[in-house]
């Protein structure tokens, strides 16, 4: 998988105000990968908020399986824009049916009580650590026989 291909999934086409279309990428699963729908829905919501706001909370509901061979339309509802917070509701649609809902809240970063560290920890880059396949191969004899087959097939996503 190329980084360019993955990042391009989050470059949505603007259909009209608050309505976006995202291309699907068939990863070989039975249905559209939910992480893609979630990421595109969040990208669509970001298109409608001021650039100084960051997502700090979202809740999602996967309603129906999506079709990886078809694009997804994202309908963003502006719930509220306040001085510090913005709220959005996003509906993902395929074939006229809602397949996913997300409610997201965005906030202007402020000083105050922190529940999580805003910065990523200092870790090696992905290229410097072994992939899941390399790990499985190195530990093949330690993995129960029924799990070996399930873990050894080629996946279109490189996990590190």
PLM feature spans:
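Terminal targeting signals and extreme-terminal segments of soluble enzymes
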Residues: 1-160
